[in-house]
Amino acid sequence: MDFVMKQALGGATKDMGKMLGGDEEKDPDAQKKEEERQEALRQQEDERKQKHIRMETEREKVRQQIRDKYGLKKKEEKEAEEKAAMEAPIEGSLTRPKKAIPAGCGDEDEEDEESILDTVLKYLPGPLQDMFKK
């Protein structure tokens, strides 16, 4: 019967104690190896970050050369100028700035409408002009 049990379980009986939290074989160098591995990972991460910083500085140099060549401004500079331009007229005002109404929208003067009507009437023949004027 023991033979059958050993064959059925295979070599698992030896590891069964370890699975249940029994005695574990401890490698005396395991802690040292783990520390070395952690240190190597930290070094790799530092190297990666330094490489990334170098690449970004090189890219920024190229971007600046292009800006200088074509007379472009940085996005931050452009936004700062726009903000300053928006705030300049507001400084002396006590009310908020009025929104500009595009042409053709909203209330229009009646004089504009009459002048358009007069312009159209000029191109009509005489009898039709009389009909529209009445």
Curated annotation (Swiss-Prot):
Quaternary structure and interacting proteins, as annotated: Binds to the SNARE core complex containing SNAP25, VAMP2 and STX1A.
Pfam families named in the record: Synaphin
Coiled coil (UniProt feature): 29-84
Name of the protein: Complexin-2
Entry's localization field: Cytoplasm, Cytosol; Presynapse; Nucleus; Perikaryon
Keywords linked to the UniProt accession: Cell projection, Coiled coil, Cytoplasm, Exocytosis, Neurotransmitter transport, Nucleus, Synapse, Transport
Domain of life: Eukaryota
Gene3D superfamilies: Single Helix bin
A GO BP entry: regulation of neurotransmitter secretion
PANTHER family per UniProt: COMPLEXIN, COMPLEXIN-2
Residue ranges with Basic and acidic residues bias: 15-85
Transmembrane intervals: none
Family named by the database record: Belongs to the complexin/synaphin family.
A single Gene Ontology CC term: nucleus
Predominant cellular place of this UniProt entry's protein: cytoplasm
Gene Ontology MF terms: syntaxin binding
Free-text function comment from the UniProt entry: Positively regulates a late step in synaptic vesicle exocytosis.
